[in-house]
Amino acid sequence: MNIIIDAMGGDNAPLEIVKGALSAHARFGCGITLTGDETAIRAAAAQCGAAQLPAGVAIHPTTETVDMCDDPATVFRRKKDTSMGAALTLLRDGAGDAAVSAGSTGALLTGATLITKRIHGIRRAAMAPVIPTTTGSAVLIDCGANAECTPEYLLQFAYLGNFYAQRVLNVARPRVGLLNIGAEDSKGTDLQKQTLALLREADGRGDLHFIGNIEAKEAIKGGCDVIVTDGFSGNVMLKTIEGVGSFAGSALKTMFKKNLLTKLAALLVMPGLNEFKERLDPNKVGGTAFIGISRPVIKAHGGSNAEAIENAVGQAIQVAQSGITEAIAEHIDKMQLPTA
């Protein structure tokens, strides 16, 4: 298993990226290919105590980087030798089993689509983070890759999320819900109403276990295993979860500091609070998979530290070993999707 990592992507590149890559190599025993400025990568490795890279860790040198200000639609035409582009090209050409980048989300999605390519028959790749729920976790698809969607896109997202839940989360029969403002069939815009009809048809064929519309609050309670939505609404939901978690943590911290009694109470509940905090910590999650691309691509968050990169590599290995891309390609013709 070899994981290709864009060493120059993210706010903390290359030091934290290289540090996380070295930790992942030691932890998982996988091969690592770092793409980027060779001098900078070696200097970062030296700072991590690796004057010489260990066997199994290689560098693919590049001369350019994708900056956050670069236009995702044109960056790979203007810059021919970027660390991100090289990672995706190596992945396409079979030099690795998955790619990880903490760089620009838009550029990574565009590059994955143009360079690594979508699975034949998939109209739009989607971002599918695994979010915490009261009872466990759920796949949220899409959460930012496609702000505007058609009912057909959402239907495909349901299938993609279903495969991810089965293959990666090991849910035998995922419950698929359509994010909406109410559970009734009459709720939502034309997009939700038309998608609802398509998903009910898929359920009737036995392709999906569709439970109907679901409100965000019910989804967070564990009401379904796959939450289907457009990228705009999904991103709002994801950022709200992150914001509420941060708010709750700050509020509890302030409350427990009030007096001696509250400080003593904090000691009693600290293990539970730490567990809650870890479930919401993006560094523990690692990254988000782009589902629908022909090879596994993992987007680590822009502020990733070494721990996040290490966990993103672990996630990349899990996705690659799950065979999800092969399963999607194998079953794409059986999904009975409306033709374009």
Regions from the language model: what does each represent?
Residues 1-43:
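N-terminal phosphate-binding or glycine-rich loops at protein starts, especially the Walker A/P-loop
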Residues 15-16, 28-33, 39, 147-216, ...:
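Glycine-rich phosphate/diphosphate-binding loop of Rossmann-like nucleotide-binding domains
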Residues 113-127, 132-140, 223-227, 231-340:
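Glycine-rich phosphate/nucleotide-binding loop
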